[in-house]
């Protein structure tokens, strides 16, 4: 299968209180298959991101647009991600109240010769949690969080994540744009929620450990198809040099 990826990226550091970056990329894949289209995929991706910090606030916002075609069908898709926080530096444990909001388009009008499903291309499967239950297509995700610094090198984060489909006309997607069978055009937009508990320990300058637990409660539309609640516990170790 033919696959080609190319692009151009520009960055501007210290743009106000943050860093600004933008890129264009071209994704080419032969014999691509979507629910509503099949053929050679040619997708142009446009991205703009701004991240920074001005105490007590921090933020990281990104917007993406996609055009092109899959076979004879045109592409028009979008996505965004926004993470922000407020740190109470004067309180014990310097708690940080955070909010993450994400969205990725789905195909709201199947059969019209237009593919609206966002393709995350090479996604970070651990973007939401280490459990990696959810893909970044046809998605609305809202996640409030609270983080405490228990020690200079140890932090504890608790969060609740709430998930919907952007449109019920399209499917629920897992990692790698895997379609959950029977979901396209059926059920409600609500797909479920999860609770997350994560501890991060910076052991040394080049060693970091993380322990994470996630409980996912599936929505009724998925439960009707046989899906069940899921629990995940995992540990991650990072070593750098």
Where in the sequence are the language-model features?
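Outer-membrane beta-barrel "beta-signal"
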Residues: 201, 228-241
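A short pocket-lining beta-strand/turn micro-motif at the edge of beta-sheets
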Residues: 152-156, 191-197, 203-211, 231-233
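C-terminal structural cap/anchor segments
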Residues: 95-96, 101-194
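Active-site proximal loops enriched in glycine and acidic residues that flank catalytic Cys/His/Asp
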Residues: 24, 63-65, 101-103, 158-162, ...
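C-terminal beta-signal and adjacent terminal beta-strands/loops
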Residues: 202-228
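Conserved catalytic-core motifs characterized by acidic clusters
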Residues: 70, 116, 167, 220-221
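Signature for the C-terminal beta-barrel architecture of outer-membrane proteins
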Residues: 1-111, 149, 169, 182-186, ...
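Flexible, solvent-exposed coil segments and beta strand-coil junctions
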Residues: 25-30, 60-66, 120-128, 174-181, ...
């Amino acid at each position: 299968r033919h696959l080609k990826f190319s692009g151009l990226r520009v960055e501007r550091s210290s743009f106000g209180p943050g860093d600004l970056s933008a890129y264009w990329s071209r994704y080419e894949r032969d014999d691509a298959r979507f629910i509503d289209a099949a053929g050679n995929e040619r997708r142009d991706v446009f991205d703009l991101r701004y991240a920074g910090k001005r105490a007590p606030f921090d933020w990281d916002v990104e917007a993406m647009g996609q055009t092109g075609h899959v076979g004879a069908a045109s592409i028009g898709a979008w996505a965004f991600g926004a993470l922000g926080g407020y740190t109470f530096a004067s309180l014990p444990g310097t708690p940080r109240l955070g909010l993450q909001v994400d969205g990725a388009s789905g195909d709201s009008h199947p059969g019209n010769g237009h593919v609206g499903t966002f393709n995350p291309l090479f996604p970070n499967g651990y973007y939401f949690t280490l459990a990696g239950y959810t893909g970044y297509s046809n998605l609305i995700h809202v996640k409030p969080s609270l983080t405490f610094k228990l020690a200079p090198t140890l932090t504890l984060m608790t969060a609740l994540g709430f998930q919907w489909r952007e449109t019920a006309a399209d499917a629920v997607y897992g990692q790698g744009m895997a379609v959950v069978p029977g979901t396209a055009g059926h059920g409600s937009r609500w797909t479920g929620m999860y609770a997350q508990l994560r501890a991060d320990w910076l052991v040394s300058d080049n060693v970091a450990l993380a322990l994470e637990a996630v409980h996912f409660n599936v929505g009724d539309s998925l439960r009707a198809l046989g899906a069940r609640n899921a629990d995940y516990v995992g540990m991650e170790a990072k070593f750098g040099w």
